[in-house]
Amino acid sequence: MALPRSIGALEFSSIGIGYQAQDEMLKTASVELLVARTICSGKYLVIVGGSVSDVQAAIKAGMGKGR
């Protein structure tokens, strides 16, 4: 497995919103899901990897869903 050239991370204050944003991120760009988990009570962390442009697109999509 080749290592991703870029990684991006988003932290959400709601597990439900984080899960929805994760889904949107993976549907928007060709990125690999590296980490998706709760990190403490009610918070959700998503880390994706891939090309720089794909990671930027995925992060933008995730941020839009998380608002």
Please give the residue ranges for each predicted region.
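The feature marks the first
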Residues: 2-49, 53-54
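Alpha/propeptide regions of enzymes that mature by internal proteolysis
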Residues: 55-64
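A common structural junction motif
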Residues: 29-30, 63-67
